[in-house]
Amino acid sequence: MAVKTPFLKLLPLLLLLLHFPFSFSTIPLGSVIYASGSNQNWPSPNSTFSVSFVPSPSPNSFLAAVSFAGSVPIWSAGTVDSRGSLRLHTSGSLRLTNGSGTTVWDSKTDRLGVTSGSIEDTGEFILLNNRSVPVWSSFDNPTDTIVQSQNFTAGKILRSGLYSFQLERSGNLTLRWNTSAIYWNHGLNSSFSSNLSSPRLSLQTNGVVSIFESNLLGGAEIVYSGDYGDSNTFRFLKLDDDGNLRIYSSASRNSGPVNAHWSAVDQCLVYGYCGNFGICSYNDTNPICSCPSRNFDFVDVNDRRKGCKRKVELSDCSGNTTMLDLVHTRLFTYEDDPNSESFFAGSSPCRANCLSSVLCLASVSMSDGSGNCWQKHPGSFFTGYQWPSVPSTSYVKVCGPVVANTLERATKGDDNNSKVHLWIVAVAVIAGLLGLVAVEIGLWWCCCRKNPRFGTLSSHYTLLEYASGAPVQFTYKELQRCTKSFKEKLGAGGFGTVYRGVLTNRTVVAVKQLEGIEQGEKQFRMEVATISSTHHLNLVRLIGFCSQGRHRLLVYEFMRNGSLDNFLFTTDSAKFLTWEYRFNIALGTAKGITYLHEECRDCIVHCDIKPENILVDDNFAAKVSDFGLAKLLNPKDNRYNMSSVRGTRGYLAPEWLANLPITSKSDVYSYGMVLLELVSGKRNFDVSEKTNHKKFSIWAYEEFEKGNTKAILDTRLSEDQTVDMEQVMRMVKTSFWCIQEQPLQRPTMGKVVQMLEGITEIKNPLCPKTISEVSFSGNSMSTSHASMFVASGPTRSSSFSATRSFQTMGITSSGPASTRISEGSMLGS
């Protein structure tokens, strides 16, 4: 009896402990935690994760969740009031109840022989039977988040409000609004089979999201987190309530801020983001929601995302209906939308047909050359996007008179003025070019046509020598002969292989044999003509071309020194580049790209800026090569959706792999990486002990923040007294501005030249990848809804798929970057 008495005294204490935190992950039957109980939780063995109640945004409500670091939910059961509880019942069912006793959520495992629960070090919450076999798991029943080591298989769905994310059987990743409208459809590269049997998605410890399946050896890499490479970082993939899918990460596995490093889509392209009749646009930093005009009011002025409502319903118009014109605005639709239809019509008929039809509430006229007109019928959900580069005008039926927003009237006037200015500039440039060609032909006719020196040359070679700007057309046999059957290989890249050749007039040339070029004869010649019309000191000159049968070749001037990478990354002391050479190469390259972007008749986006495509002449002046081989952009809209983009990982801007439009700012990003390599002498994607196993660009920014810029400098230059540290600082600052995640945070190449030359003061740059505008702090999450783009990966590849299926009135969408920050923000006043 003396032995039993102490045990009986301890029994109440043991029972009490069932209601309080455990040191181990095992959770016995009968355990309970209360919403009102401070510090009550069921922790994982390493205390990284815990099951607990965290405050909800709604007042006096709490979310029952598995949390990271005690405050960041990665799985949730639901929300209850302060008297709610989460209990593992003796029946084996895990149940969340409100203070009134109402069941909010139930695991429905009361007949599965559950004997205990457990929260693992991976963040998985499981219920076990008497054989320690899981019968229920939070990983198998995800809510809005996927963590590392969690397998997300086809058929599972993440949900957040009206939005959902799922992995299709085909391997595609989709984001949907209200289960019907697919506004993001990210597919596998066409080289993979679309007939997958059981694909699974996984967020790897290095920050790469991959799809695995028996038919995919090694898996297919889908997207990269902006801080990929560091396996000591905790990351998770979350569907936020704004409809965007983001990758978050924390540098600490136990605490600290959680930042977003990638998001799936431009925020204004999220279907329904601004509610019914809401129009999404941007201010300097964030997406904003507005009504189409003053004929509408906000449903809730305190929450503009709830949409708008008509001040006067169409049924009360008494025949006084008219059309509200919204320029540069696109109302969204989706595939198989039952409340919309399309046909071919011009802008005026598209507007008039809708006005006269009782079944039409709005229409959209595409001004992208397609001639499409889309009509929205009663029952439609109206959600749209407005930005100056959007190639469409939307018409919304309203009760007259139209009361337009001030911003819309100003935009329309500015648009008309800009069109007039563009016409004036275009006519002047064309007239100047025609005059120059006429003078050159006249000079040749008068002075050179009878010169015997040209007697043995064909008319093509005569044109080569004396009519600069007109490319010479070679036959395939001529180029085969001058390269000795393509014997001496100079290099290879994403567009083909380069060979050394000697023309009959003894001119040494570089002959590029193009691969994967599918354009027809006429289109190829037009692009060659455009490339050959570009003349700049820092561009490699195109001499001629061959377009014969399936053969497509380009002939360039020859650079004996080869490309920049031969000097920058070599250990050969004979090829060492002094600081003066490096700075001049950086400046020359910037000037060459500026010419392509801002001074050509057509904006030429290079799409593959890297050291291998920067050649060095005998005087070590930079010559940019391979420009114009990607699609030329419309000067009125320098955005382009590429279905098979080419580039080199490590230099690709985040928007490439995020399926967002490619612009001239994508070249700026690539140039920024090259700039950092010129300073450091190291590849931007190098990971080593010196960089603490971080990507070099991220490590370099951390050293810059510490004021240790000299650590970034090439060690071979560290003892060189001739190094201009002011130039080093300008190059480093400029490089970090160039590699900002958001395209409009990056400077134009014209600004880059000014920054390098010291014409303008450069403000300290923002962290290019490690600091995000979406972050968790304490128990709450704050977001500016800035879209975080995917980062380029550490290895090279020549081709990526960039197809997109989200349709905006039937046309593939091409929205702008989500964060609208003025380029002036990086420059001093």
From Swiss-Prot:
Glycans are attached at N46, N98, N130, N151, N172, N178, N189, N195, N283, N320, N416. GO terms for molecular function: ATP binding; calmodulin binding; carbohydrate binding; protein serine kinase activity; protein serine/threonine kinase activity; ubiquitin protein ligase binding. GO terms for cellular component: plasma membrane. The chain crosses the membrane at residues 422-442. Gene3D superfamilies: Bulb-type lectin domain, Phosphorylase Kinase, domain 1, Transferase(Phosphotransferase) domain 1. Residues 26-421 are extracellular. SUPFAM superfamilies: alpha-D-mannose-specific plant lectins, Protein kinase-like (PK-like). GO terms for biological process: recognition of pollen. ATP binds at L490, G491, A492, G493, G494, F495, G496, T497, V498, K512. Keywords: ATP-binding, Cell membrane, Disulfide bond, EGF-like domain, Glycoprotein, Kinase, Lectin, Membrane, Nucleotide-binding, Phosphoprotein, Receptor, Repeat, Serine/threonine-protein kinase, Signal, Transferase, Transmembrane, Transmembrane helix. Residues 1-25 form the signal peptide. Residues 26-140, 143-260 form the Bulb-type lectin domain. Residues 484-759 form the Protein kinase domain. Residues 572-589 are annotated as: CaM-binding. It is a single-pass type I membrane protein. Residues 317-399 form the Apple domain. It is found in: Cell membrane. This is G-type lectin S-receptor-like serine/threonine-protein kinase At1g34300. It comes from Arabidopsis thaliana. The lineage of its organism: Eukaryota, Viridiplantae, Streptophyta, Embryophyta, Tracheophyta.
